[in-house]
Amino acid sequence: MKTMRKITAIIRREKLEDVKDALELMGIHGMTVSDVKGRGQQMGIRESYRGMDYCVDLLPKVQLEIVVDSEDLERTVEAISENARTGDVGDGKIFVTDVIDVVRIRTGEHGRDAI
């Protein structure tokens, strides 16, 4: 069984379509996308509402989860990074973890065949 990796990318909402398009051009169609909130170096933003100042310290982001074969890892991470980057604080993070197995529930397929 080939080694698989899970890529978890936290990116700006407005960059999601660019990242999805780049991944689809590479033949990567399967992904899970979730709305998340978080903070890092950006530390939130100040907003004014009806004359009152508020600090929003958990900012909305999008989380993508993608499982790929190890040989596709570098180019996939590169595509996400290039297409999610604005150059500003708050562009996000990419995490890579090992995947022991994947099982397609409908068919019982394992490993690469289940991705």
Swiss-Prot record:
Cited SUPFAM superfamilies: GlnB-like
GO biological process: nitrogen fixation; regulation of nitrogen utilization
Pfam family membership, one: P-II
A single cellular component GO annotation: cytosol
InterPro entries assigned to the protein according to its UniProt record, in alphabetical order: N-reg_PII, N-reg_PII-like_a/b, N-reg_PII/ATP_PRibTrfase_C, N-reg_PII_CS
Domain of life assignment: Archaea
Keyword set, alphabetical order: Nitrogen fixation, Nucleotide-binding, Phosphoprotein, Transcription, Transcription regulation
Coiled coil stretches, renumbered: none
Residues modified to O-UMP-tyrosine: Y54
Coiled coil among keywords: no
Gene3D superfamilies hit by this protein: 3.30.70.120
GO molecular function: ATP binding; enzyme regulator activity
Transmembrane segments: none
Signal peptide per UniProt: none
Cross-referenced PROSITE patterns: PII_GLNB_CTER, PII_GLNB_DOM
Family, similarity comment: Belongs to the P(II) protein family.
Free-text function comment from the UniProt entry: Could be involved in the regulation of nitrogen fixation.
This protein's name: Nitrogen regulatory protein P-II 1
The species this protein was found in: Methanothermobacter thermautotrophicus (strain ATCC 29096 / DSM 1053 / JCM 10044 / NBRC 100330 / Delta H)
